[in-house]
């Protein structure tokens, strides 16, 4: 059984009422901006009526120049069907803006307008970017630590499945990976991004690659807004090898046509990331130069420079290339993080570290304990990780033939709250992220002279002498990652400090600086930890 066969969607489970989306219509999913105002990093949309004859997707060009003072941002528009054209803009600074359209269609050309951008509302920190070399933050400087999950079919699954998935993610994960192009769901006929001219064969010859199905993208946009409202970033996978309609082997000009249309529609959503592909090296019809080209197209077409990466199966992409903002890896060899940072000089997210679940294949039956452990190993090595889950569905009962979580279904495993526990620990401990301490006897990370986090993995020492700086006092907290408990130790510690430990595996301890030592340092000076 292959992963693409296991991760199929079955019947939906109960709808989470609070997240039940509205019935899809042909109207824009974007809240009206006709009042003339939009928040910083919000989405301002211009809707115009224009030609509907011929093929507006290819025949009509449309863009707008958004100007504030001496600065102008060029943004491309798109055709949304039924004679409607849209231009979407994400303003990154407050104050007055004006715009003027440019189009090959006379009725769309030279349209002008003004609006005001006001301060962002609570919870809106702007798009995520890289920061502090190996970490991330929002545009307003708010720290962002990616603790993500995987819901491949979220953008094109049923509303019921999407509601279950959103309910499971909310409050637990702050990023999800989802495919823009569909994969087979095993539920009969699916809505598709391109019209068809009959039944497509493996090469996609029956697809009408000259136009798009706007309803497909409108549903996707609705899901993006739902994620945004829940504080979840959307890592949008642009290509993948799992389709049944020939999209993985489209002609080169169609690839570019699809990318430009998708970016014109989605780039103004502040929570968008671009994943050029999932398991790019399994898309046999594309070459490495094709993938480089796709990166350049995305980089050129996206006026906001959202994060960009690419995910692999066996052949790791060269993430040192300038158009790649961070590394997205399918691996769990976290011990190589240091050499990868040295080679790429960029943040690393281990986006696929296998799956918690119970399926036959080795990649899909991790215990919750092992999934939790792998997140700790990623963090302690100065990197990040993403969760995935795939359980066998029941043949009968209330959840018969339900979707797996990683194809946007119900969250069933036990690792998610433990991952959230780690996320909270990191967020309370640092504003910039944890950096690995090279040469530490036991795995450790933190900020020199401020924060020290040790993780003992499968070791279970009864005590250990920690080499803390002797120029400051530190408070210590014992952490049980799976039980999700913290025990603050009495007193403070400085210099070489021997501490009794729980004598059980997979434990951690965190030291936080509470004060500088005034005058002569006390305690033994720290010395390098001696290897065996």
Where are these regions (language model features)?
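Extended acidic/polar, glycine-enriched regions
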Residues: 75-131
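Catalytic-core region of carbohydrate-active enzymes that cleave or remodel glycosidic bonds
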Residues: 321-395
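Aromatic- and carboxylate-lined catalytic core of secreted/periplasmic carbohydrate-active enzymes
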Residues: 357-358, 371-488, 503-532
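Exposed aromatic-hydrophobic patches
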Residues: 86-89, 496-502
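N-terminal export signals
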Residues: 5-24
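C-terminal segment of N-terminal export signals and the immediately downstream linker at the start
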Residues: 20-36
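Active-site mouth of glycoside hydrolases
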Residues: 122-336
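Surface-exposed beta-strand/loop patches in extracellular or lumenal glycoproteins
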Residues: 43-56, 459-470
